[in-house]
């Protein structure tokens, strides 16, 4: 979650409805057809496949409320989830307690800033930064520092996995007209809500403001409206490659989605697996 999003923000309150889990959502119907457009329909299964190849322990940076980490723990992996938002981690813990008791000992939650990560473990086999989470750190320097922090916590043969939207598919000029995005159930109240969304144009720093409101129909029939606002900073294909190189990674695989599709200009996503390299060794090879 963004550092500039307060714990009382509506986007945090509705998070589990906006980004439902196919495996542990209270209301399974929230996992609707729109999740395919959002990029939520197949990503968890892809993370499971990668984790089965790398083994654990697993680090998830910007873990949110556990949509990715909990299913990984269910499959038997030790998972450390890091998020800057105390409220998001509370929701994670609540979702976790609904699982079998033995799952609790496989999950460690840490409230830390991803740009200044300082964990006891530095031998993670894989680190996931899932579902646009890197973009939600809306500053170039902070995004780069997050990648550097991730590298410091990976084993020598560790893998970093990034899932970010393909910016070539975005409306760079924005979309000033609010539109209903979807109607779902609020996991906290059971009430039906509709999310309305709009976006500003990219600014000179490639930041884009995403904003709108939630209309929730309460028990008496009255509608409660709550506004939300956040920024993200989309990253282009060769920009992320240069950032990864600067952080000490090289791209091992670049795919256009979660089903191993080849990356093209029309791909909805950039799904990246990167491995560590030694700067001095790499410089020696080039010389």
Predicted regions and their residues:
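A short acidic, Gly/Pro-enriched loop at the edge of an enzyme's catalytic core
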Residues: 118-126
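SAM-dependent methyltransferase
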Residues: 161-241
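Conserved class I S-adenosyl-L-methionine
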Residues: 1-64
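Conserved SAM/SAH-binding loop-helix junction
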Residues: 67
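Class I SAM-dependent methyltransferase SAM/SAH-binding core
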Residues: 71-116
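A short glycine-rich, Lys/Arg-flanked "PGG" loop and its adjoining helix->strand segment in the class I
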Residues: 144-156
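C-terminal lobe and adjacent flexible extensions of AdoMet/dcAdoMet transferase-like proteins
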Residues: 231-287
């Amino acid at each position: 979650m963004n550092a500039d999003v307060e714990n009382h923000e509506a986007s945090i309150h509705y998070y589990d409805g906006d980004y439902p889990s196919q495996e542990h959502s209270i209301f399974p119907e929230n996992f609707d057809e729109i999740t395919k457009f959002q990029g939520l329909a197949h990503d968890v299964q892809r993370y499971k496949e990668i984790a089965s190849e790398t083994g654990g322990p697993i680090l998830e940076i910007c873990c949110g409320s556990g949509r990715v980490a909990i299913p990984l723990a269910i499959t038997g992996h030790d998972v450390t989830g890091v998020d800057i938002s105390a409220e998001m981690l509370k929701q994670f813990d609540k979702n976790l307690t609904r699982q079998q008791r033995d799952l609790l000992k496989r999950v460690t939650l840490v409230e830390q800033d991803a740009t200044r990560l300082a964990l006891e473990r530095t031998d993670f086999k894989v680190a996931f930064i899932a579902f646009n989470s890197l973009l939600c750190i809306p500053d170039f320097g902070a995004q780069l520092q997050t990648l550097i922090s991730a590298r410091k916590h990976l084993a020598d043969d560790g893998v970093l996995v990034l899932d970010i939207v393909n910016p070539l598919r975005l409306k760079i000029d924005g979309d000033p007209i609010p539109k209903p995005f979807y109607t779902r159930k609020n996991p906290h109240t059971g009430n039906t809500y509709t999310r309305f969304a709009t976006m500003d144009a990219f600014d000179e720093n490639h930041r884009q403001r995403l904003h709108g409101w939630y209309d929730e129909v309460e028990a008496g029939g009255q509608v409660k409206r709550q506004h939300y606002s956040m920024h993200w900073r989309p990253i282009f294909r060769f920009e992320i490659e240069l950032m990864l190189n600067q952080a000490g990674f090289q791209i091992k695989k670049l795919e256009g989605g979660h089903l191993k599709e080849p990356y093209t200009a029309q791909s909805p996503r950039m799904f990246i697996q990167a491995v560590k390299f030694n700067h001095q060794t790499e410089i020696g090879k080039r010389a």
